[in-house]
Design a protein with these regions (language model features):
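Residue-level signature of transmembrane alpha-helical cores of multipass secondary-active transporters
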Residues: 19, 23-24, 60, 100, ...
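Small-residue-rich hydrophobic transmembrane alpha-helices
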Residues: 49-109, 146-165, 273-337
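Membrane-interface helix-loop junctions in multi-pass transport and translocation proteins
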Residues: 173-207, 337-339
Length: 352
């Protein structure tokens, strides 16, 4: 198949590592959008960080929902590639993109319309609530870019070409880093400036993906982005992606109410500390998800090709790789927690 990297042959350790590193880096880049916003907005004060932190949980929830088509793409397209069925691979790719667009429009519309009652869950001061509502409404209009880019990323991961999403997402992050101080301080837009910078960066990532697929790669021999949904493919995608998306969404939902408790007990400082700490802690589970995603793409191709022994060896390899990194992060957070937190929010009241 055109543009595909065969994962059913060759050294397992090297293939997993080469596949996982760009995926992990891409996950860190997605996390870095929020951390970059917090690092710059932190210079405006803890109240501004609390405003975008309250929206950060909803951004996390949106990313969790987008996993339906990211995971759906990785497994459905990957299995089709392993089974040497290019027609199914192309159909699954088109269906995942179409479903991602539909869900993103519906979810983004809900967040935009109900922004005020959602943000008031946190019971913040009125001026912080107003900033958060404006920030959420700006971000919600860019959700189709995020969901479609997630589907594109899943398709590339399934094809064994995880470096492409990494470089594209990295370009978006660099643009966000450049635009954040310009919009926040240069144009004097404050928290709204961070939202506009992120919106432009995410839109740019989407456009680069479109250019890459249409003009450079012709992945899977080329496939239509949008298609009329068929029950066979749609049901399979939901069966594969919905459990992961539901679990992550419930996790984000629980954290939303933990944020309310933090706000009730500690005001905007409590909320800001909780949300920022969660973003930093996400380093660990973003890493584990990176390896998990690489393992999913690897298993999808090898399972469909009947290479069960490679599936088992890949699973054991992933366990010890993630175990080593998890131990390192635990030591870092336990012994250097204050220093890590102060990088993003320099106010001592937030981390002491």
């Amino acid at each position: 198949m055109q543009g595909i990297k065969n994962l059913t042959q060759g050294p397992i350790n090297r293939q997993l590592f080469n596949l996982a590193m760009p995926i992990m880096a891409t996950s860190f880049i997605q996390m870095a959008y929020s951390l970059t916003d917090m690092a710059w907005v932190g210079r405006l004060g803890s109240e501004a960080v609390a405003a975008i932190g309250s929206v950060g949980i909803l951004t996390w929830m949106s990313g969790s929902i987008s996993l339906l088509n990211k995971v759906g793409s990785e497994v459905s397209v990957g299995q089709s590639i392993g089974a040497q069925s290019q027609e199914d691979a192309r159909s699954f790719a088109s269906h995942n993109i179409t479903i991602a667009l539909i869900i993103s429009i519906c979810w983004g519309t809900l967040l935009f319309i109900f922004a005020e009652p959602i943000i008031r869950i946190y019971e913040l001061e009125d001026h912080i609530t107003a900033n958060a509502i404006q920030y959420l409404r700006i971000i919600s209009t860019g959700l189709p870019f995020i969901f479609l880019s997630a589907a594109f990323t899943g398709i590339y991961n399934a094809a064994g070409r995880s470096k492409v999403p990494f470089f594209i997402s990295g370009t978006g992050l660099i643009l966000n880093i450049i635009l954040d101080p310009l919009f926040i301080f240069g144009f004097g837009l404050g928290t709204n400036g961070a939202a506009y910078a992120t919106w432009i960066a995410e839109a740019s990532v989407f456009l680069i993906f479109v250019y890459q697929l249409r003009c450079r790669d012709a992945l899977l021999g080329g496939f239509p982005f949008f298609t009329r949904l068929k029950k066979k493919y749609t049901r399979r995608i939901f069966k594969l992606g919905l459990p992961v998306a539901t679990l992550n969404t419930l996790f984000a939902f629980v954290n939303m109410f933990l944020c309310r408790t933090a706000s009730e007990q500690g005001g905007h400082i409590g909320l800001m500390t909780f949300t920022t700490g969660g973003q930093i802690e996400a380093i660990t589970w973003n890493t584990s998800q990176g390896f998990s995603t690489a393992l999913s793409a690897f298993i999808a191709q090898n399972y469909a090709a009947g290479r069960v022994e490679r599936v088992l060896r890949a699973w054991y390899t992933t366990l010890w790789m993630t175990g080593i990194f998890g131990t390192f992060c635990t030591l870092l957070f336990v012994f250097f927690g204050n220093e890590v937190f102060a990088i993003f929010v320099p106010e001592q009241a937030a981390y002491e």
